[in-house]
Amino acid sequence: MAPRTIVKVDLNKPAWEQPNLHNRWHPDIPFAESIDEGETVKIECLDWTGGQIKNDDSAEDIKNVDLTRIHYLSGPFEIKGAEPGDVLVVEIQDVQPLENQPWGYSGIFAKENGGGFLDEHYPKAAKAVFDFEGIFCSSRHIPGVRFPGLIHPGIIGTAPSKEILAEWNRREGALVAENPHSTHVMAQLPNASYAFAGILADEKLSATVASEGARTIPGRPENGGNCDIKNLSRGSKVFLPVHVPGAKLSIGDLHFSQGDGEISFCGAIEMAGSITIKCKILKNGISDLAMKSPMYLPGPVEPHFSPSRYLTFEGFSVDESGKQHYLCTTTAYRQTCLRVIEYFRRFGYNDYQLYLLLSCAPIQGHVAGIVDIPNSCTTIGVPMDIFEFDVSPNGKAKIIDLGSCAFANS
């Protein structure tokens, strides 16, 4: 028997006019639907921008994206029988793009509007559109590359209790207050602009959620959320703590593929799609599992590349100016990314194409060493078989015409 579809989305309608969606974490957002323990259900989701990005050859939409109108999640769902202190086990049975939108996109935000991990080096907005062909994808904006997707939800989480929500706002607010002169946005605090508690919320509740609801941008230890873990694919199980009656599970931000780190921020292959799940409740699971943050079991369905076919680059806690940092994995990983870009630039790609590819292709990022002072060492393995030409390290590269990603017109 086909699973019950509990959320359907309309790609031609604004997200805030559709039922069963919301874009804040708050314990009082009304249930969208109820799910029985052990019931298999299908849930449709908008892409993470709510339809702001188009299938075209300009990055104007990426440059001008409204980051207050994002993460319209499907939910929250009541899981019947779930109570605070339990653990909710969500089995991801399938994830697919919507049949009427067989494409996705990866983007680089402009430094002044969101930025990304390498925005000091690559401040301009850029975009690549990917077409889906069964399990494979390819892009006219990054020619010479084709790979299978590891399709997954970027966001899956439960609602916080009122106490946990207050703690989030306290600690994230303190971080912002402690860094008044930072050149980076330290945290996204509650923001009433385009806050959406769902069409079932009355005016008073909508105002409450707008003023105190947590933004969905970061993942958090108490509920999971936007962790962007590429291995939460078909067949995986994610274990989430329950803090409110019914759990109030929400899901969204579906990805066709993503590299470890999702470094460009809008960096997976973002898509509208559907996810099929089944839930199990572990009573008293938070205590029994000594759980302080979510955990997961990967599924058996992943693209397989021979270990010997990953061309692997190293980076250390020494930045591009030669400054030594102490065991800084952020510096090391940024340097690893730059080493990858420098290598593949030799074949004819521009740096923005490679920045996008690093973010959305099935690369493997690892912390190799974190004890050998003063340097951390991180690695990035790039599967050479995603390329349609030889990229192995055999001397001087042959430069070929590899086109360009999309840029903004202004």
Curated annotation (Swiss-Prot):
Q: Where, subcellularly, is it found?
A: Cytoplasm; Nucleus
What Gene Ontology molecular function terms does this protein carry? formamidase activity
Task: Say where the protein is mainly found.
Answer: cytoplasm
* Gene Ontology terms: cellular component: cytosol; nucleus
Entry keywords, A to Z: Cytoplasm, Hydrolase, Nucleus
Annotated EC:
3.5.1.49
EC top class named in words: hydrolase
Q: Name one Pfam family in it.
A: FmdA_AmdA
- SUPFAM superfamilies from the UniProt entry: Acetamidase/Formamidase-like (SSF141130)
Q: Which domain of life is it from?
A: Eukaryota
Which reaction(s) does its UniProt entry say it catalyses?
A: formamide + H2O = formate + NH4(+)
- Entry's family note: Belongs to the acetamidase/formamidase family.
Q: What does this protein do?
A: Hydrolyzes formamide with the production of ammonia which can be used as a source of nitrogen for growth. May also act on acetamide, propanamide and butanamide.
Describe the subunit structure: Homotrimer.
Q: What is this protein called?
A: Putative formamidase C869.04
List the source organism: Schizosaccharomyces pombe (strain 972 / ATCC 24843) (Fission yeast)
